[in-house]
């Protein structure tokens, strides 16, 4: 996985991630939408034959896009740990 910042402003961040597809894009964008202060969280695949995605994050200014991304990633980590705990009990 390679990550490049395509565009960054005070309330906007656009990342290009090589080697990933809808799986990561949908997971991260979905979690970003639940972070307070995020007003836009989306992703797209620039080309269907390339493993590459672009994530766009826009905030209302109460949180930076990078902080929102960090919170979303932490949420995903907690979700994964919770899933593994539940799976062990089955």
UniProtKB/Swiss-Prot annotation:
Location of this chain's protein in the cell: Cytoplasm
Any GO CC annotation of this UniProt entry: DNA-directed RNA polymerase complex
Protein name from the UniProt record: DNA-directed RNA polymerase subunit Rpo11
EC number in record: 2.7.7.6
SUBUNIT field: Part of the RNA polymerase complex.
Enzymatic class: transferase
Keywords, comma-separated and alphabetical: Cytoplasm, DNA-directed RNA polymerase, Nucleotidyltransferase, Transcription, Transferase
Molecular function as annotated in GO: DNA binding; DNA-directed RNA polymerase activity; protein dimerization activity
GO biological process: DNA-templated transcription
Biological role stated in the UniProt entry: DNA-dependent RNA polymerase (RNAP) catalyzes the transcription of DNA into RNA using the four ribonucleoside triphosphates as substrates.
